[in-house]
Amino acid sequence: MPERKAVRKADQKAGQKADQKAVRKVEQKAGQTADRCPVPRPVDSIDAGSLWPEIEKILAPGQGDRAASDAILADIEAGTALARTQSSLLRAPDPVVAALLSTLERQVAEGRASLPDQRHSATDPSWMTRADFCYLSVRACAHDGVSGSFIQAAKLLPAIAADAIHLAPFHPIHFDVVYAPESPSVVDPALADPVLSAAGIGPENQLRAFIRACRLLGKAIGYDLMPHVAQFARVALERPSLFRWIHLDDKRAGLVDADPSRPYGREEREEVAGMVAGICVSAKDNYGISSLKRMEGDDEATTAAKDRAYYTAIRMCIENGIWQVPCHAWNGAGAPAFSGYDHAADYPVFAYRNDRGEDVSAEAYGVSSPYAFYDGLLPNSITEPDSIPIPNDAAIDYFSSIFSGWSALHGFDFVRMDAVDRLLWSSLDTEGTLPVSDGLTPLVVRRALQAARKGHPGIGALATRYGTEVEEFAREGFDLLMGSDMMRRIDAPLLREALALHDRLVERNADPSLHRATVCFAVDAHETSSTRQWGAAMATIMGPVRMGLRHAVARFLSVGGGRRPLYEVMGFQDLSTGLYESSLATRGLQWNDNAAFASAYAATEALYRRLRPFLDTAAIAGRYVCGTYAWWIIVPAGRSGPPHRVVVVALSLETGEGLDPGHIDIPLTSSWGELEGRVHHIPGSTGAEVSVTGSLVLQLKFLECVIVDLEPSQSFY
């Protein structure tokens, strides 16, 4: 179209492109010209220390509720993991948790207890390597016809042994998918308890109450940062310049005014963003509103007007052939390529290919769209010398501000960065600036983490990398990797690799000049039942014995400088299932209420807590792994002469035959003399007495773990 080209040429010459003006106009009208995510303060904000007493007044606990609360409090004050199941705590009346947390709040107010220092206020994020983590989804707390809400989520906290909560996304969503957010700056009102909302404690304050509950119970809290939003998310319509778009012709057969081989340049993005901006302004003007974003405090009429304007804007975009470009597959090259239009379903079809031209559409999720961190990506192809992608600073800055906004307002202690599993292979240059595809690059990650830690150097960072490249990820600013243990059985190859990783971590973390970092031992993760992984819940596939063995290995292989934080998920404690499914549909877990497993979980945690002061300063002195069993010996680190304590861990490994290892003989250093102590079977006994000299003889059953705690006989207690 020569007319359009002439207009563009004139605009370029004047430095005032029409599309940029349109984008600027809509963002000014929405009050969102700054490249930051505008996280709003709660309406009628309540002092954090007053939230649970106020909730207690609203819910009015009765005598029975207070008795139940006192019983839970007694268990907490005993200092051991609760043997009560998460299912039973969840099904307790709401006033019980209100009474419990209000009591803890009064103890703080009266000086009988103190809140632990908030981890993000630390001088560095090394606390992450000493913490343990649990994934918790508010929506998945639904049960027995009760919707998942922040107050339901707070009920689970006393039965979670981990001291850091990885909070799943809590924003409004599309397609019922938790990881397809509509806006990263709003708390989803669907996660708010309606009784509390009606009483004046809205969604933002209910989130604050949950975070306060974590603080009262000594737990850090983490935010889940996503580099994408739902397709046609509200933020995409109001901030279109942050995203990548296509504009189709009237027949939906091809792109308008864009080279199909290079459709994702800055000029193309800004032009279509200007059209989206104009559509958004028109829709908002028609309904008399200034923003599409649903805000706490909006009355019913305003909310309805915003929704009508929002869906009108989506319809107008579709009618004009304008679509957001979806996320590429994790192993894709460049950005997805428009390949046709499904006229029956009325949506564009994209091709997803890797750098070898192979179809990788099976790995793609078409419901979300990435921030346009770079302009100039090629369709299904990596960068060419004459088409170097250019950073889109506005998108990078906006993404980098999301966590900072939430942390500044609510005090989040760490960020879990989603979609970084391929980070080490995401760029073509050593500086991490030239992207292979539309995902995060080291450049973007570094800027986001720098923004997160500005003024708060203690902010931690967890990478969703299912690997052990701790050195490389630490250089980018991460403190933890997820690891891949949740994808494997406890067998000889895993133990050999885990012990080798332990040695790597010990050597690395002994160097004070390096950023301290480690790898989690994940007993489970929220997505392990997906078809890309196990295909069903691990608890269902493995059963209580194998899950208990995973728990024991995670705890007692974590020694000294090779410590690996436990990573668990809500429901693990009583083998409840359905966490992945709850991220794709509005539903809760299948609350299995397995009291026997919860009791075994509590026993393992109690033993670990008793041994932890020793384990944290100890070292693995000897080890052995064969096809059917493994053992390792833990002694004080850096000590010459006979040790004052020895802990031996022995376990039967997963095998195809499923036979008992039977009699095993573990050699001990003869100069240690006679040792005596207790043998703890997991799961099983609380500890039988034993006395040994020179070697330790054990009988191992299939999939059994045995912990032997020994001291020199003259000092045995």
Please state what every model-predicted region is:
Residues 2-5, 31-717:
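Active-site and adjacent substrate-binding regions of carbohydrate-active enzymes
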Residues 4-34:
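Long, intrinsically disordered low-complexity tandem-repeat segments
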